């Protein structure tokens, strides 16, 4: 077997390391040599903080890539939220990870690489969100004139919330609900978006009143300080809010993307409070002025109506004047009605007398004699005619009986019987109709008799005068003074004695 000394370099002075030893030596060398460095690069592979709070990503340029990690404590101290593609300057130390022979930078501080890079990123985001319609003026909501509750999204400490509450208390005291958030740093954007969405999910009748308007406020600061309000999640939450939102981020010269998505932008948090509520004293003064104007207008209105009423009352005729013409027309109509009733009664009496003369007993007796003679002649002719008819029908029947079989006869008999039944029913119906017609005619004649009778005249307030023999008195000239008369009214007779007096003229003679 060959000796170990046969291998090249076996007896050299090169030190021998284990894998762990060489990895540890490299780690110490890197950390000692690059204990504190500043690295400029573009963020790549950023997915937000891990569940542990740490963030893992890489910094790259056009020729190399450096793995990076930010521990949870350093992550919470960042003044902006890292985003994919953002160019930053990271401050930290280099180290290696022996388990995979990789080196990385542990970032302690990080800031955007100049305002130009942030502005370029901001402009790109602005154009993209505008193309989606999130800044469309048609989506803007009107602020309520007199809100009941105002929701404020800001830091619970500092001058901003104190200025807002103080200004609201001075102008129009009402309930203010504060949703505390961080207004700077990596978690600023998500917390503001959560607050806006949380206010929108409050029910109208819940234990916490739903605000009528929201104020998202923060004091002034650099572009990096205000970067959380340029976060896309904040812009989308404000644009989707069903509650009107006032943006009051930074000073008047500062602007963020939330200003474009909000329904109203205020130059300062104090200005936002002034936009949200009116001045109570101004409202009271306006109410008093409007009330005075209304009272004055109502007073003038009632004065005008009173004057118009008095003028109308003076122009209106009295009741006697209004009724004079109708009364005259009524009297004339009553007079014409009396004459018309008298004339109509005379005409009906003449017509009735004519019919009565036609129905004299002599004429009726002659008519009855003629009818009896006719009936007697018919009675004499009927037996002979009936016997001849029966002989003829019997002969025809015998002749047909010899020619026909029983079956057709039976069918014809049944058919004839059915026809006879139908004829019977039709006869009964015709008789009923005739009886009804006669009855109606009798009723009409009865009504005519009652109409023509003088008793119907008595029902209308007239009276009939009879002499001592019970005959009606038709003319005043037929009555002598001292004659006993009977006056028949609707409900009975009254005996009277005639005496000399004026003769009432016949009203028909004046026509």
From Swiss-Prot:
Its main location: cytoplasm. InterPro entries: Exonuc_VII_L (IPR003753), Exonuc_VII_lsu_C (IPR020579), OB-fold_nuc-bd_dom (IPR025824). One of its GO terms (biological process) is DNA catabolic process. Pfam families: Exonuc_VII_L, tRNA_anti_2. Keywords: Cytoplasm, Exonuclease, Hydrolase, Nuclease. GO terms for molecular function: exodeoxyribonuclease VII activity; nucleic acid binding. It catalyses: Exonucleolytic cleavage in either 5'- to 3'- or 3'- to 5'-direction to yield nucleoside 5'-phosphates. It is found in: Cytoplasm. Its EC number is 3.1.11.6. GO terms for cellular component: cytoplasm; exodeoxyribonuclease VII complex. Belongs to the XseA family. Heterooligomer composed of large and small subunits. Bidirectionally degrades single-stranded DNA into large acid-insoluble oligonucleotides, which are then degraded further into small acid-soluble oligonucleotides. This is Exodeoxyribonuclease 7 large subunit. It comes from Brucella suis (strain ATCC 23445 / NCTC 10510).
């Amino acid at each position: 077997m060959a000796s170990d000394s046969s291998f090249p370099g076996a007896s050299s002075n090169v030190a021998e390391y284990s894998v762990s030893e060489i990895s540890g030596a490299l780690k110490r060398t890197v950390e000692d040599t690059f204990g504190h460095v500043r690295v400029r690069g573009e963020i790549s592979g950023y997915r937000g903080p891990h569940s542990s709070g740490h963030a893992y990503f890489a910094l790259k340029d056009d020729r190399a890539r450096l793995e990076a990690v930010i521990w949870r404590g350093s992550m919470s101290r960042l003044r902006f939220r890292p985003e994919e593609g953002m160019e930053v300057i990271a401050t930290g130390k280099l180290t290696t990870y022996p388990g995979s022979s990789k080196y990385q930078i542990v970032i302690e501080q990080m800031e955007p690489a100049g305002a130009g890079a942030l502005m370029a990123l901001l402009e790109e985001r602005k154009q993209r969100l505008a193309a989606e319609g999130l800044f469309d003026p048609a989506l803007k909501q009107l602020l309520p004139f007199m809100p009941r509750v105002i929701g404020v999204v800001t830091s619970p400490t500092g001058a901003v919330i104190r200025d807002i509450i103080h200004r609201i208390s001075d102008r129009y005291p009402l309930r203010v609900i504060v949703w505390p958030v961080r207004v700077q740093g990596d978690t600023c954007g998500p917390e503001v978006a959560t607050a806006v969405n949380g206010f929108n999910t409050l029910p109208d009748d819940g234990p916490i009143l739903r605000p009528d308007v929201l104020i998202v406020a923060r004091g002034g600061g650099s572009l990096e300080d205000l970067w959380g309000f340029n976060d896309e999640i904040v812009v989308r939450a404000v644009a989707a809010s069903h509650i009107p939102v006032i943006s009051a981020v930074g000073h008047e010269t500062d602007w963020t993307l939330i200003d474009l998505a909000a329904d109203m932008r205020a130059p300062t948090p104090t200005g936002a409070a002034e936009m949200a509520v009116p001045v109570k004293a101004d409202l009271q003064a306006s109410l008093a002025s409007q009330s005075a104007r209304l009272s004055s207008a109502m007073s003038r209105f009632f004065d005008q109506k009173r004057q118009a009423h008095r003028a109308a009352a003076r122009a209106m005729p009295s009741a006697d004047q209004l009724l004079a013409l109708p009364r005259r027309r009524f009297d004339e109509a009553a007079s014409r009605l009396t004459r018309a009733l008298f004339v109509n009664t005379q005409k009906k009496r003449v017509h009735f007398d004519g019919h009565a003369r036609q129905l004299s007993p002599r004429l009726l007796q002659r008519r009855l004699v003629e009818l009896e003679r006719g009936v007697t002649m018919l009675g004499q002719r009927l037996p002979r005619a009936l016997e001849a008819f029966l002989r003829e029908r019997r002969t025809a029947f015998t002749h047909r009986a010899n020619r026909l079989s029983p079956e057709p006869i039976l069918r014809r008999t049944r058919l004839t019987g059915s026809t006879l039944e139908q004829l019977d029913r039709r006869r009964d119906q015709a008789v009923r109709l005739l009886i009804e017609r006669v009855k109606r005619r009798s009723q009409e004649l009865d009504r005519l008799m009652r109409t023509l009778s003088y008793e119907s005249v008595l029902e209308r307030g007239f009276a009939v005068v009879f002499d001592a023999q019970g005959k009606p008195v038709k003319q005043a000239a037929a009555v002598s003074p001292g004659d006993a008369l009977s006056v028949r009214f609707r409900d009975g007779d009254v005996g009277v004695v005639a005496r000399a007096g004026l003769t009432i003229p016949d009203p028909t003679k004046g026509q």
